[in-house]
């Protein structure tokens, strides 16, 4: 590894973290969950939000950043929410620095005790840091006897100045499942060109490959989320009404919004033997 560009060190809670510096930006990725917790371009506020109350402990989920939801999304009886990948100890298997200073890291999800049903899958996560943050989650059915169903999602928490001054575009005309309190999972259509967040919001947008832009009037910034290999977009803000663990201060809802890219619910994937699927997300920003 280049000592100047990539450093594997001890982070919060004593957890191993990879710190990255490029000519344009800096980033941090914890091996616990292969969890991106920081991405900041020079001269800008951070693009990624992490709760001040988040736990940093082995085997515990980090509140904020980019949790990897896999191999399922949401709740499953008797199982951890959003799957086991986000709390597993991933392995850093490759790092590279391009001539221009761009950094690429590759992480592998190891075989885990008690997860033998998933052992025929191979899952890797790549992080490329430059002026843009590019993330890639690849799952291959290397040795399963038959097709296996999975859900995947990069559950990105974005840092905003004031949620009341934020609007999201790119979802007009798209069907979504309303999972907020009182929504009862009803299927609805996004009618407005711009989505505002004035209350608890939990929507799974279906059959969409569109980019989403987050216009932040407070920070005078536009964050663009582009994706490939994804047919679902999730927009989430818990407001003060959704009950969460004590790793999130309800007041923090003012400074974050999740725009998540993946394949969940009706858009879940079926991987036949010998097939693979890659979910890729590119995050960029500009003044606006």
Spans of features found by a protein language model:
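Extended, loop-rich substrate-binding clefts of extracytoplasmic carbohydrate-active enzymes
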Residues: 80-130
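Short, structured beta-strand/loop micro-motifs enriched in basic residues and often containing a Trp
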Residues: 255-265
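Short, hydrophobic/aromatic beta-strand segments
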Residues: 38-40, 145-152
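Beta-strand-rich interaction surfaces with strong enrichment in secreted/lumenal proteins
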Residues: 58, 124-126, 266-271
């Amino acid at each position: 590894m280049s000592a100047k560009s990539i450093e594997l060190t001890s982070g919060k809670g004593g957890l191993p973290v990879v710190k990255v510096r490029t000519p344009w930006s800096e980033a941090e990725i914890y091996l616990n969950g292969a969890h991106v917790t920081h991405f900041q371009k020079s001269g800008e506020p951070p693009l990624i939000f992490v709760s001040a109350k988040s736990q940093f402990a082995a085997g515990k989920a980090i509140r904020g950043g980019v949790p990897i939801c896999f191999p399922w999304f949401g709740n499953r009886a008797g199982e951890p929410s959003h799957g086991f990948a986000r709390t597993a100890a991933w392995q850093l298997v490759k790092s590279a620095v391009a001539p221009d200073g761009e950094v690429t890291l590759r992480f592998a999800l190891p075989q885990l005790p008690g997860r033998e049903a998933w052992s025929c899958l191979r899952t890797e996560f790549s992080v490329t840091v430059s002026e843009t943050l590019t993330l890639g989650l690849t799952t291959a059915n290397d040795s399963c006897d038959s097709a296996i169903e999975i859900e995947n999602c990069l559950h990105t928490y974005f840092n905003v100045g004031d949620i009341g001054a934020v609007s999201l575009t790119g979802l007009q005309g798209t069907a979504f499942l309303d999972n907020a309190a009182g929504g009862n999972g009803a299927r609805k259509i996004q009618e407005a060109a711009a989505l505002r967040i004035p209350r608890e919001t939990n929507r799974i947008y279906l059959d969409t490959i569109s980019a989403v832009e987050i216009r932040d009037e407070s920070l005078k910034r536009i964050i663009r989320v582009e994706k490939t290999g994804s047919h679902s977009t999730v927009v989430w803000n818990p407001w003060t009404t959704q009950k969460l663990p004590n790793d999130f201060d309800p007041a923090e809802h003012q400074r974050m919004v999740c725009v998540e890219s993946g394949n969940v619910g009706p858009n879940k994937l079926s991987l036949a033997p010998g097939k693979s699927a890659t979910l890729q997300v590119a995050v960029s920003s500009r003044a606006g």
